Amino acid sequence: MEWIIAGLLAVIAFVGGIFYRKSIAEGKIGSAEDRARQIVDDAVKEAEAKRREAVLAAKDEVHQMRIEAERENRERRNELQRLERRLLQKEESLDRKMESMERKEDNLQRREDEIEKLRAGLAETLQKQVAELERLSGLTSEEARTLLLSNIEDEVKHEAAMMIKTIENQAKEEAEKRAREIISLAIQRCAADHVAESTVSVVALPNDEMKGRIIGREGRNIRTLETLTGIDLIIDDTPEAVILSGFDPIRREVARIALEKLILDGRIHPARIEEMVEKAQKEVETRIREEGEQATFETGIHGLHPELIKLLGRLRWRTSYGQNVLKHSIEVAHLAGLMAAELGADPILARRAGLLHDIGKAVDHEMEGNHVSIGIDLAKKYRESREVIHCIAAHHGDEEPRTIEAVLVAAADAVSAARPGARRETLESYIKRLQKLEEIADSFEGVEKAFAIQAGREIRIMVKPDKVDDAESLRVAREIVKRIESELEYPGQIKVVVIRETRAVDYAK
C-alpha cells in the first residue's frame, strides 16, 4: 500500500514537475516574446529615425542642387544678356558704318561725275589749245612731240652725266681714302732712317804732328794719296783731324780706310801708301758685297745674280738729294711689298722690283744714259724677269705702268722720297727754291699773299675775294701748279692751296 502511495506520490510529483517546468517554460517564452517585441519596436524606431535622417539629407541635397542650378541659370542669363548687348552694339556700329559707306559712295559718285565732266572739258580745251599752238607755232603735234622728246633726252643726258660725275667723285674719294689707309699702314710698318749723309769724311789724328807726316817731304805723300784715290785731303787748322772731300763716296771710303791704316801703321811714304790703298780697295769691295747681301737678306729676296748684289752694295755709298740710295731702295722694297700684300698683288715681285728700281744709279756716273735706262740694261743683262724690268722702266713714268706691281713700286718710290727727313738740299738751293715758289704764286693777279710752308712741300696762297671768285680760285691753283712743274726742280711733290676768304664786319653802337 505504501508502495502504491509512494508510486502515486511519485507520479503526482512527476506530473507536478512536468507542469511546473511547463509553467516555467511558458514564462520564459513570454519573456522572450516581450524582448523580441521590444527589439522589433526598437528596430522599427531606429529605422524610422534613419529614414527621417535620409529624407532630411535628401531634402538638403535637393535644396543645394536647386540653389546651384539657380546660380548657374542666373550666370547664363547674365552672359546671354551681355552677349545680346554686344550684338546690339555691333549691329548699331554696322548700321553706322553702312550709313557712312553709303554717304561716301554717294560722294564718290558725285565726284566721279564732276571729274568726268572736268575731263571732258579739259579734253576739249586741250584740243583747242593744241590746235591753237599748232597754228601759232607752225608745228604739228607730232613735230612738237619730237621736239619735246629731244629736249627731255638732253635733260636726261645731262642728269645722267651729273650722276656719273657724282659716282666717279665718290669712287675717287673712296679710292683715295683706301690708298691713304694702305700707304699709312705700310709706312707705319716700315722703319726708316733720316738723312745723315755728307760729301766729306773726317779722319781723327793722334796728334797734330801727324799732319806733317801725311803731307810728306815737298807734299809727295799727300799728292800720292790724292792721285791714287781721287779725293782731296784738306789739312787746315782743325786740331787733330784731316778732312777728306769728294763726291764719290766709294773713293772717299777707300781714302779714309787707307789713311786710317797708314796712321795706325806709322810708316807713311809713297810705296806704303800704294799698298794701303790697294788693301783698302779690297776691303771696300768686300764690304760692297756684304752690303748687297745684307740688303737682299733684309728684303727677303733670293736668286739675284752676284753682279747685281755687288751693284746693290755700291748703292750704300751713293746718295740722291742726300738720301742714301741703298736705304732708299730697301725702304721702297718694304713699302711696295706691304702695299702689294694689302691689295692682293704679288708682294715678292713688288719687293724685288722695289729693291732693283734704282740699280742704274750704281754706275750712272760710269755709263751713258739716265739711271732708268741703265737699270733696264743691267736687269736684262743679268736675266731678271720681264715684270721686274717693266717696274724699273715705269717707276719714273718712262713707260706707262701695265701691272699693279709697277704702280706700287712707283708709289713706294714717291713715298720714300717725299717723306719728311728723307732728302735734303743745300741751304742756299733750299732758300732759293722757297723764294722762287713764293714768287711764282705772287706773280698771278688777285694774289694777296703767298707762304711756302712744310719745308717747301706746300704753298698757301691768299687771294682777294673781290677779284677772284670760287671758280677763278680753281683756275689760279691749276695755273700755279703748271708754272711750278715747268720752272722748278724739287723732290717729291708740292701741295698748292688757294684760300679765298670773305669777311663781313659791322659794329653795334
Curated annotation (Swiss-Prot):
A GO molecular-function descriptor: RNA binding
| Swiss-Prot/TrEMBL GO biological process terms | mRNA catabolic process
Q: What is its main location?
A: membrane
Organism for this UniProt entry: Heliobacterium modesticaldum (strain ATCC 51547 / Ice1)
Name by which UniProt lists this protein:
Ribonuclease Y
**Transmembrane intervals:** 1-21
**Alphabetic keyword roster:** Cell membrane, Endonuclease, Hydrolase, Membrane, Nuclease, RNA-binding, Transmembrane, Transmembrane helix
Tell me which GO cellular component terms the UniProt record holds.
Answer: plasma membrane
InterPro entries the UniProt entry points to: HD/PDEase_dom (IPR003607), HD_domain (IPR006674), HDIG_dom (IPR006675), KH_dom (IPR004087), KH_dom_type_1 (IPR004088), KH_dom_type_1_sf (IPR036612), Ribonuclease_Y (IPR017705), RNase_Y_N (IPR022711)
Membrane topology reported for the UniProt record: Single-pass membrane protein
* Function field: Endoribonuclease that initiates mRNA decay.
What region holds the HD domain?
A: 325-418
**E.C. number:** 3.1.-.-
The UniProt record lists the KH domain at 199-262
